[in-house]
Regions:
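Long lumenal/extracellular ectodomains of secretory and single-pass membrane proteins
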Residues: 1-373, 383-568
Length: 568
């Protein structure tokens, strides 16, 4: 009976996915659930889905604590899994080696706040402060607070974030090189006006505590807001921010070389004095001169004379901007030169990927950010793969796309766009295209198996023959059948990397599946896990082992150390 109970406690049920295919769903196993949670931590605007992920994270922490207290698991297993869950917070927010997600990271913070407020506060501290680059930036203060207020939780965390920001401002006001904290302080007349008042009241708390009457308190509050405005203005002048020059009608003094990747990306049309359709915005001399400076800079970038920062731009935003430039016929504009240059700079964070092929899901369920991210990730893989610049798109019908004639990012997007987008998800047809080519060319087993097949998708594929089971089982069986067809000996499948780009409740594989990986998110950073892995190592890898490798980055050791101290 005990064996049956244990089997049920660790059982992973199956379900029918959105388009009729068999898939795994949320598991009863703690370890399986941790990997599944990570796999579904991909950007979404669906509040109900985020709430579901919050529930799963909460259940995992609750189950771990209960199992440890009732002696169902040893201390080592308890601490190990708690450490993974805590490091997952850092990885989810990390803009350097992780997923770079805001809302999902705040959701995980809120869950940890429910279980351990000290650890939640420490994790947030790592978002904004660190010996190296923090996981996020000072921008996280206002957005994290907004999330907590909307979900009516985290008051201690909110107070701590306010304390951290104001302490940094006190350091910056006397520092020769201030941080960017002041840049991200919300303005009084903005959507974050209530937070501005809280920040000002905290910074000048002595004004308010000395007030003895309602009238004097009102005056003290007014003075605290006025002085806080002056403080932020002084620090921003010290930082010499773009906004200061724009507000001062000194656009021509904005230096193109000093712009951050995000500022250049978001304001390139403003700097160039252009509308989206390429028309001039204004004839003001200051704006025209500014545009001239940025046009010259863009021209130098196009010829390779200078670089334009692009590492912090989301891959989905690259594709979105490229499609917009294509739509308006602006592929040869200065805006296009800037976007292409930023793509080149962004690509520096991804190493050579060996023999990897990208399969891009361009079906209707991927529309919007998931599709844009899939296209950009697929193009990044094509550029870095030893096999050459090729991608396979799939929707109603697959298309093998040769990108050799494309000399920049926008031209690659334009070429891929000619495939059929927005239809159903006929993954079987895409897989058969690969297998038919293998048969036609009579490829040897080593040529078939020695590669990574990366499926960039939401994994909601069309119904296949039920005998094949899950998506991974389908792939393995189809490769085995092809080997038998050619050589009377089954092929091993190549290493399959399932890269999830839309949060659902389905899973293509179990955590213990050999020769497979399960990643997710819009950041290319996790691709680097495959830069040094040979095929022998990959064939023995499982989704769990690759996940643990990703979470074991030195950047997250500080979280593990703090958790061990807290739970000692």
């Amino acid at each position: 009976m005990a064996a049956l109970f244990n089997a049920l406690d660790n059982f992973t049920p199956s379900q029918i996915g959105e388009n009729g295919h068999s898939e795994f769903t949320w598991s009863n196993s703690t370890r399986e659930s941790i990997l599944q949670l990570s796999f579904q931590l991909t950007r979404t605007k669906d509040a109900a889905q985020i709430d579901k992920l919050s529930y799963v994270a909460d259940q995992i922490l609750t189950q771990l604590t209960t199992d440890y207290k009732t002696n169902k698991i040893e201390r080592e297993e308890y601490l190990g899994h708690m450490s993974i869950m805590f490091r997952l917070v850092g990885q989810t927010r990390d803009i350097i080696e992780g997923k770079g997600e805001y809302t999902l990271a705040y959701m995980l913070l809120a869950v940890w706040y429910k279980h351990n407020r000290t650890l939640a506060k420490f994790a947030f501290q790592c978002f904004v402060l660190g010996e190296g680059h923090p996981y996020g930036s000072w921008k996280d203060v206002k957005y994290m607070i907004k999330y907590m207020e909307e979900h009516k939780t985290g008051e201690e965390l909110i107070e701590y974030a306010i304390y951290l920001l104001n302490m940094q401002l006190k350091i910056d006001i006397i520092a020769e090189t201030p941080s960017l904290a002041a840049k991200w302080v919300p303005r009084e007349k903005s959507a974050f006006s209530r937070l501005f008042v809280r920040l000002a009241s905290d910074y000048y708390a002595d004004y308010l505590t000395s007030a003895k009457t309602d009238h004097s308190f009102t005056k003290a509050l007014s003075k605290s807001k006025m002085d806080y405005r002056k403080l932020i203005s002084e620090l921003n002048r010290k930082l010499d921010t773009v906004q200061i020059k724009q507000c001062g009608q000194a656009w021509s003094k904005i230096d193109p070389e000093k712009q951050t990747s995000i500022t250049m990306h978001k304001q390139k049309t403003a700097f160039l004095n252009k509308t989206k359709s390429g028309k001039q915005r204004t004839e003001l001399d200051d704006r025209v001169l500014c545009a001239s400076h940025f046009e010259q800079f863009a021209s130098k970038a196009a010829s390779g004379e200078v670089e334009i920062k692009g590492k912090r731009i989301g891959l989905n935003d690259f594709t979105k901007d490229a499609l917009e430039l294509i739509r308006y016929g602006q592929q040869k504009s200065s805006e296009a030169d800037i976007l292409n240059a930023q793509w080149i700079n962004n690509a520096l964070q991804t190493g050579n990927l060996g023999k990897m092929v990208a399969m891009i899901d361009v079906s209707g369920s991927m529309s919007g950010d998931p599709l844009n991210a899939a296209v950009a990730l697929g193009l990044r893989i094509a550029e870095k793969s030893l096999l050459g610049k090729r991608v396979l798109t799939f929707s109603a019908s697959p298309k093998w796309v040769n990108l050799d004639g494309c000399d920049d990012f926008i031209s690659m997007v334009s070429t891929v766009q000619h495939a059929d987008w927005g239809m159903n998800t006929n993954f079987m047809a895409a897989l058969n295209l690969i297998l038919d080519a293998i048969v036609q060319q009579k490829l040897q087993p080593e040529d078939v198996e020695d590669m990574v097949l990366t499926i960039l998708s939401d994994m909601q594929i069309d119904q296949a023959d039920r005998e094949y089971g899950s998506m991974m089982e389908l792939i393995e069986n189809k490769y085995a059948e092809t080997g038998m067809r050619l050589y009377k000996k089954p092929f091993k499948a190549p290493h399959i990397l399932f890269w999830n780009l839309r949060s659902t409740s389905g899973f293509p594989s179990l955590s213990s599946q050999k020769n497979a990986s399960m990643m997710s998110g819009f950041s290319p950073a996790l691709l680097n896990l495959f830069c040094e892995e040979g095929i022998n190592a990959l064939q023995s890898c499982t989704p769990w082992s690759l996940f643990i490798k990703s979470i074991n980055s030195d950047r997250y050791h500080i979280l593990e150390q703090r958790l061990f101290e807290e739970l000692a």
